[in-house]
Amino acid sequence: MPGNNSAKGTATGNATALWRNAQLATLNPAMDGIGAVENAVIAVRNGRIAFAGPESDLPDDLSTADETTDCGGRWITPALIDCHTHLVFGGNRAMEFEMRLNGATYEEIAKAGGGIVSSVRDTRALSDEVLVAQALPRLDTLLSEGVSTIEIKSGYGLDIETELKMLRVARRLETLRPVRIVTSYLAAHATPADYKGRNADYITDVVLPGLEKAHAEGLADAVDGFCEGIAFSVKEIDRVFAAAQQRGLPVKLHAEQLSNLGGAELAASYNALSADHLEYLDETGAKALAKAGTVAVLLPGAFYALREKQLPPVQALRDAGAEIALATDCNPGTSPLTSLLLTMNMGATLFRMTVEECLTATTRNAAKALGLLAETGTLEAGKSADFAIWDIERPAELVYRIGFNPLHARIFKGQKVSP
């Protein structure tokens, strides 16, 4: 294989576990393509990768282990990463889905009590325990497809206590399943009815004090916002981001989904982890993201569910050198999707992304979009031993198949956790 096709550890002592007789898609950026390695082995020591590369290059001090698994020639990829979800919410919006199919407009749905108002009402009303119980099946579905890291946003409270409740529930989920959960504070998601037409007051009274509390309680790993005509302006989001920056919290942004307000450029000016959606992103915005190292997170589930016509400018992002990630955008209204494998197929089919781009988008680039690239997202020495073993003949099957899950095993922090 061309390039550096191994990752050697520096620590001494036997490996904790060996996965032998495998084929690797390392996603190592120092290698060509997906970083494929044949006749490969992964050595794990104390939950971290000590070596990932050709069996012939395995150091002697790692050649024996407490446990050895013969992978039978199967493919191993980094564990998948869903870097944009709204996984915690109350109720569901199946009724408005039926209304939309029958021709109801957004306004008619809203008047009937649907839309985000419905999710806010249900999320406010439910206890932590019920929200956990409702979120677990969604979480389990993602984990069953080889996902080991998931971002979860608040944003269906729109008052301080419910926003914090959602973040606490997300933290609770991490204690109930073998998964890494990253939280984003998204009070700047919409304006509640009692602040209609008073965005500035809502930010002053709710968003900023809630951010302070979320930070003080260690509930927020990042701060998000929705920059759009139906949500918040660039100037309004700038206030939120300035407060996040003062507290040392990274930012990310829903931007350019329905129009181009310049949200991506705002995100880039803060060196945001990511800017997400981006259907109406222009060339200037794409270049700004690339220059800032801000990942462009595309969300084909929302594009599909909303029957959008405006495609995100994938070629402009490529030309600018921006890194692209894909995510489910799991939410009750516009993307009730809990399959990252299907998301990859949508990225390829709807957005014309390549197999290599789709695999990179749900591993390495998704890790970067969460600020976790030093920890996970590739099969390299020193990183957490998070990987997925697949019953496939070639990695393209993960993108090509629809409604099929070929996961053989999921390894999280060096432990086999499913199925």
Swiss-Prot record:
Comment on bound cofactor:
Binds 1 zinc or iron ion per subunit.
Q: What is its main location?
A: cytoplasm
Subcellular localization is given as: Cytoplasm
Q: How the protein assembles, per its UniProt entry?
A: Monomer. Forms a tightly packed homodimer in the crystal, but this seems to be an artifact of crystallization.
- Give the protein's recorded name: Imidazolonepropionase
State a GO cellular component annotated for this protein.
Answer: cytoplasm
Which prosthetic group or cofactor does it need?
Answer: Zn(2+); Fe(3+)
Q: Which molecular function GO terms apply here?
A: imidazolonepropionase activity; iron ion binding; zinc ion binding
- Annotated positions binding 4-imidazolone-5-propanoate: R93, Y156, H189, Q257, T334
EC number(s): the record gives 3.5.2.7
Give the originating organism: Agrobacterium fabrum (strain C58 / ATCC 33970) (Agrobacterium tumefaciens (strain C58))
UniProt keywords (A-Z) are: Cytoplasm, Histidine metabolism, Hydrolase, Iron, Metal-binding, Zinc
Positions with a binding annotation for Zn(2+)? H84, H86, H254, D329
Q: Where does N-formimidoyl-L-glutamate bind?
A: Y156, N331, G333
**Reactions catalysed:** 4-imidazolone-5-propanoate + H2O = N-formimidoyl-L-glutamate
- Residues engaged in binding Fe(3+): H84, H86, H254, D329
Give the UniProt record's GO annotations in the biological process aspect: L-histidine catabolic process to glutamate and formamide; L-histidine catabolic process to glutamate and formate
List the Pfam families hit by this protein, alphabetically: Amidohydro_1
Q: Which gene encodes it?
A: hutI
Q: What does this protein do?
A: Catalyzes the hydrolytic cleavage of the carbon-nitrogen bond in imidazolone-5-propanoate to yield N-formimidoyl-L-glutamate. It is the third step in the universal histidine degradation pathway.
The family assignment reads: Belongs to the metallo-dependent hydrolases superfamily. HutI family.
Q: Which InterPro entries match?
A: Amidohydro-rel (IPR006680), HutI (IPR005920), Metal-dep_hydrolase_composite (IPR011059), Metal_Hydrolase (IPR032466)
Upper lineage is: Bacteria, Pseudomonadati, Pseudomonadota, Alphaproteobacteria, Hyphomicrobiales
Pathway the protein acts in? Amino-acid degradation; L-histidine degradation into L-glutamate; N-formimidoyl-L-glutamate from L-histidine: step 3/3
